[in-house]
Amino acid sequence: MLQPKRTKFRKMQKGRIRGEAKGGSDLTFGTYGLKALQPERVTARQIEAARRAMTRHMKRQGRVWIRIFPDTPVTSKPVEVRMGKGKGSVDFWACKVKPGRVMFEIDGVSEPIAREALRLAAMKLPVKTRTVVREDW
């Protein structure tokens, strides 16, 4: 599972995901990619599930790049605990994804296999997505 080795602070405020992605909106490594169309918090487990779905469908051929990293700690309080008494402990790690962000890239496989692999990955994610293809070849 993806998570940072060390962070400056243990816990983070919730915040909001506003605006479009400033960077990471173009394909950099692969020929095919999966682009987010709405703002959402994607967890490390969801990223790993999407990666597994893609690599299984591609039968270990080609290459997959993960362009997002879960660097936001999400806290939760235990079940049946009253309000107050401080912020809960870190439960999982997540990545705040803005619209326009390329989350995964694929290369080294044919177009039908790549599109199906990205479709399977999109089903594991809580974000509406679009498959993008590099045009400058």
From Swiss-Prot:
Q: Where is the composition biased (Basic residues)?
A: 1-16
Coiled coil residues, start to end: none
Q: Report the family membership.
A: Belongs to the universal ribosomal protein uL16 family.
User: This protein is called what?
Assistant: Large ribosomal subunit protein uL16
Q: Which domain of life is it from?
A: Bacteria
> What biological-process terms (Gene Ontology) are attached?
translation
Q: What the protein does?
A: Binds 23S rRNA and is also seen to make contacts with the A and possibly P site tRNAs.
According to the UniProt record, where is the region Disordered?
1-22
One GO cellular component term of this record is: cytosolic large ribosomal subunit
A single MF term (Gene Ontology): rRNA binding
Q: How does it assemble?
A: Part of the 50S ribosomal subunit.
Q: Which UniProt key words apply to this protein? A: Ribonucleoprotein, Ribosomal protein, RNA-binding, rRNA-binding, tRNA-binding
Which CDD domains did the record assign? Ribosomal_L16_L10e
Matching Pfam families, A to Z? Ribosomal_L16
The protein's matches in InterPro entries, at most eight in alphabetical order, are given as:
Ribosomal_uL16, Ribosomal_uL16_bact-type, Ribosomal_uL16_CS, Ribosomal_uL16_dom, Ribosomal_uL16_sf
